[in-house]
Regions:
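Noncatalytic, basic helical substrate-engagement surface that gates or grips nucleic-acid strands
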Residues: 1-143, 156-169, 246, 252-253, ...
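Non-catalytic nucleic-acid-binding/docking modules located in mid-to-C-terminal regions
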Residues: 42-55, 76, 82, 123, ...
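Short, polar loop motifs at secondary-structure junctions
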Residues: 146-151
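Short acidic/glycine-rich loop or secondary-structure boundary segments that cap or lie
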Residues: 152-155, 211
Length: 292
């Protein structure tokens, strides 16, 4: 299967459209996103199977655990020249259209991000591949379409490839075990997660994080946290990052909802796609409908 980080694909296309014209153009964004999906399917379906569009839900379980999660993004949007209320309104409209009209599984789960959906489905396929190989059958390959390096850790399951559609290059060459160990230590500033030496509020309050030297990262990434977390505070901050960053810590109830939703989804009928394109004046896509 081809797991598409749909939020990333949509926002990337939307930002390209805004670079061409300052006004948000619904028709242009719709066409660009659909054309991107057509290109992905044409290039990768033969090797990896069908597209699965994975979306963020408005409610994140990580924010329940850590209120500052992605808090810096909201602050940055408030400083942006773009009207993000209008942008999110358009993205939600297109998501609803795709659910109703595209012949793929379009999945959104309460409490989950697209990252969670992709991680859970990769793990599920990894377990299925073990059973297939035990029965002397070939494993099923999975492709992640996203530039997010968080997904490097999913290569631990085997037969998982990642392609960055924005840079048009494969994401490879990094050891998933070492990557996740370093990522937990360093945190993720873009998600509002400080390094494990720093307290919860430092990024939101604009304070500098405590210095974490590269030599320490190189050493500690090969050790158990019990070997270098010398205080309860440090251990708690390490566990904070581990829970937020390592996909193995996705809550069981979220994982079960993702699997149940995926297995129960029935894609829209491909035969109805032409009328959707015609209604939205996507005339050049009508002729390519059989390739969707």
């Amino acid at each position: 299967m081809i797991l598409v980080d749909a939020n990333q694909v949509m926002i990337a296309n939307l930002m390209v459209s805004l670079s061409q014209t300052e006004k948000l153009q619904e028709g242009l964004v719709r066409h660009m996103v659909l054309n991107s999906l057509l290109n992905y399917r044409s290039e990768f379906k033969k090797k990896y199977g069908e597209l699965v569009l994975c979306y963020d839900n408005r409610h994140y379980w990580r924010r329940d655990e850590y209120p500052h999660y992605k808090g810096t993004r909201k602050r940055d949007r408030e400083k942006s020249k773009h009207n993000w209320d209008n942008i999110f309104e358009l993205l939600n409209k297109l998501k609803a259209e795709f659910l109703d009209h595209l012949p793929y599984k379009v999945i959104e789960v309460d409490g989950a991000e697209a990252d969670d959906i992709i991680a859970v489905l990769c793990k599920q396929q990894g377990l299925a591949n073990i059973r297939l190989q035990n029965n002397l059958q070939p494993p099923v390959k999975t492709l992640i379409l996203s530039g997010d390096k968080d997904f490097i850790q999913l290569k631990r399951y085997g037969y998982v490839d990642q392609y960055n559609p924005c840079l048009k290059k494969w994401v490879e060459g990094l050891d998933p075990k070492l990557y996740i160990a370093e990522h937990i230590l360093k945190g993720d500033r873009s998600d509002g997660i400080p390094n494990f030496l720093s307290d919860d509020s430092c990024l939101m309050e604009g304070r500098r994080q405590k210095s974490l030297a590269k030599v320490k990262i190189a050493k500690w990434s090969t050790l158990s946290p019990e070997d270098f977390c010398t205080t309860t505070e440090l251990m708690n901050q390490y566990r904070r990052n581990q829970k937020l960053i390592d996909f193995e810590f996705i809550p069981k109830d979220i994982s079960e909802k993702i699997i149940d939703t995926y297995e129960s989804l029935v894609p829209a009928n491909r035969s109805d796609l032409s009328s959707y394109f015609e209604e939205n004046e996507l005339n050049d896509l009508v002729s390519a409908v059989n390739y969707f």
